[in-house]
């Protein structure tokens, strides 16, 4: 089997935050083509009513799987996967879905102070899935859940080159920093794939140094473990497609996609 015969990997997000995962996945799976799908017509997911979002994502994947027949699907969105992951697997049992969930377990293993914060969207914060992760893996820690209404949009603007005021960003991340009994938060879980693009800004504005935990590499490793590696291959050249459900990404977004080796196609 040649690399041209291999099925592509589909990476899905509500916007362009999933590019953080795509970047890592390409490093580990150089023999594969990728399809990046941004449901920008539904962005942001954090404020959606749960039933409506489930229906939207499940229906969208019906179309995507029929058209592209991928090897696996990476759901590079905490909000989507914590809500719809089980339903996607039930609706499409023939497909393998690799999910993105808040990196609470590794945070609990690494913290020295026992104070961990999870910076997420409101949707991820309120999910029972997230609270179950805390109960299962971080019950010995004090975990602060911080649901930002604005950071995903701000990250999209930042990635496109727009300037953000420091005080506005600081207001979003400030609740992550907790002092208790002489201890301080030492790990912040970035529980939205958009947020790692702003990690340098977060580091600069943070009241004190913390470990910002980005799950992208772990997601890519999990995907690699599920994708068969052919014997003898050469890394692929050429651009992969990016699909935006709105059908009309702006110029800055198209330019960004080119920087990631992606060519925008109509949905």
UniProtKB/Swiss-Prot annotation:
Per UniProt, what is one Pfam family of this protein? Asp_Glu_race
**A biological process from GO:** cell wall organization
Q: Give the record's keywords alphabetically.
A: Cell shape, Cell wall biogenesis/degradation, Isomerase, Peptidoglycan synthesis
Q: In which pathway does it act?
A: Cell wall biogenesis; peptidoglycan biosynthesis
Active site: which residues? 77, 192
Q: InterPro entries this protein is in?
A: Asp/Glu/hydantoin_racemase, Asp/Glu_race, Asp/Glu_racemase_AS_2, Glu_race
Enzyme class, broadest EC rank? isomerase
**EC number(s)?**
5.1.1.3
The role this protein plays is: Provides the (R)-glutamate required for cell wall biosynthesis.
Tell me the protein's name. Answer: Glutamate racemase
């Amino acid at each position: 089997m040649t690399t041209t015969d291999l099925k592509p990997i589909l990476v899905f997000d509500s916007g362009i935050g999933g590019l953080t995962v795509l970047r890592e996945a390409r490093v580990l799976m150089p023999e594969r083509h990728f399809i990046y799908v941004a449901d920008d017509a539904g962005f942001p997911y954090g404020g959606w009513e749960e039933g409506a979002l489930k229906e939207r994502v499940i229906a969208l994947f019906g179309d995507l799987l029929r058209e592209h027949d991928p090897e696996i699907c990476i759901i590079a969105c905490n909000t989507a996967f914590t809500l719809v992951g089980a339903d996607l697997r039930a609706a499409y049992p023939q497909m393998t879905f690799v999910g993105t969930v808040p990196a609470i377990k590794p945070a609990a293993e690494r913290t020295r102070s026992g104070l961990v914060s999870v910076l997420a969207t409101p949707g991820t914060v309120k999910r029972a899935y997230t609270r179950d992760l805390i109960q299962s893996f971080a019950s010995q820690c004090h975990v602060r859940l911080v649901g930002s209404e604005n950071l995903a949009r701000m990250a999209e603007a930042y990635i496109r080159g727009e300037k953000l005021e420091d005080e506005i960003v600081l207001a979003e991340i400030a609740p992550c920093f907790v002092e208790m009994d002489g201890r301080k938060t030492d790990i912040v879980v970035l529980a939205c794939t958009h947020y790692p693009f702003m990690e340098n800004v977060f580091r600069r504005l943070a009241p004190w140094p913390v470990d910002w935990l980005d799950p992208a590499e772990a997601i890519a490793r999990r995907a690699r473990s599920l994708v068969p590696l052919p014997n003898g291959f050469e890394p692929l050249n050429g651009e992969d497609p990016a699909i935006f459900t709105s059908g009309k990404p702006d110029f800055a977004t198209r330019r960004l996609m080119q920087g990631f080796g992606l060519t925008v196609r109509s949905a």
